[in-house]
């Protein structure tokens, strides 16, 4: 099938690779290069980098609302566009241009977690399952009818990074199935009940309040890893907590009970991956060799 691909971050790359292997990708649309790193040099998106490696033409317009951009898009003569974490709203002339419209790969069980950060929000909310929906796009935010859906369990120690990688691969597999069966798929309108929105993650959500229950802090750590990274102060230094598990233990909120097990409002969490500022992430044994925490030390955020 003759396709346009639209995506930008790492999550989109396996989908691009799958489409390139099985279909004709006539053009790749992604976000433009932006300043990044210490030198603030323009850095292309992961999708642009991979597309160029594959020898695919790349476009990164800052808007798709101009008549010129819309004419260029339509002139590609694509049968369909596949959209996954692109980063721009598609106006109606873009949605209407491909013969079979635009298909979106969304990382949630719609209508739950429409919006920008469905993987983070599913873990933060304590959801036991999530999945991938292939959706026929329309003008609303993730409101289109669902063509195909697959569920997956969220593991008790899974982080955003873990789930991100699994769902990315699932999306690549599912879109191939959807494209192959497109003539037979029946669009299923999303129900009005159960709609929730996955707002972008704010850095202000990352500071840990140790008076909260261990179950909530566990979700916060896993649901913000690796970015922006839940953090606390230990011995006056900000430390990111990137992996954890629920643990036995009781004590004053924030008290270090031994190793990297920290008491919460109720229960405790055992930190299994932590990162000091300017250092790489470390498991507890290595972390504590260079940063000893005597029993009775306190974690806090202010």
UniProtKB/Swiss-Prot annotation:
EC number: 2.1.2.9
PROSITE patterns linked to this entry: GART
Compositional bias ranges of the Basic and acidic residues kind: 279-288
Keyword Protein biosynthesis: yes
Region (Disordered): 279-302
Keyword Iron on entry: no
SS bond list: none
The protein's name: Methionyl-tRNA formyltransferase
């Amino acid at each position: 099938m003759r396709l346009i691909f639209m995506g930008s971050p790492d999550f989109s790359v396996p989908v691009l690779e799958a489409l390139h292997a099985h279909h004709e990708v006539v053009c790749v649309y992604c976000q433009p290069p932006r300043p990044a790193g210490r030198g603030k040099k323009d850095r292309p998106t992961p999708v642009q980098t991979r597309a160029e490696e594959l020898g695919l033409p790349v476009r990164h317009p800052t808007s798709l609302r101009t008549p010129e951009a819309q004419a260029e898009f339509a002139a590609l003569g694509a049968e369909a566009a596949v959209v996954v974490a692109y980063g721009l709203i598609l106006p109606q002339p873009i949605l209407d241009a491909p013969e079979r419209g635009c298909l979106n790969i969304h990382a949630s069980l719609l209508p739950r977690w429409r919006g920008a950060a469905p993987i983070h929000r599913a873990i933060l909310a304590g959801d036991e399952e999530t999945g991938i929906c292939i959706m026929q796009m329309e003008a609303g935010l993730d409101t289109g009818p669902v063509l195909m859906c697959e569920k997956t369990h969220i593991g008790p120690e899974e982080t955003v990074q873990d789930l991100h990688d699994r769902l990315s691969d699932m999306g690549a597999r599912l879109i191939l199935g959807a494209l192959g069966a497109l003539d037979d798929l029946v669009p299923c309108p999303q129900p009005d009940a159960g709609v929730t929105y996955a707002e972008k993650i704010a850095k202000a959500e990352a500071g840990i309040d140790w008076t909260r229950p261990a179950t909530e802090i566990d979700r916060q750590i896993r649901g913000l890893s690796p970015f922006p990274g839940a953090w606390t102060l230990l011995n006056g230094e900000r430390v990111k907590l990137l992996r954890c598990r629920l643990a036995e233990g009781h004590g004053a909120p924030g008290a270090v009970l031994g190793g990297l097990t920290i008491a919460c409002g109720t229960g405790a969490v055992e930190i299994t991956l932590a990162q000091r500022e300017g250092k790489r992430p470390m498991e507890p044994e290595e972390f504590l060799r260079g940063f000893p925490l005597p029993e009775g030390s306190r974690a806090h955020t202010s």
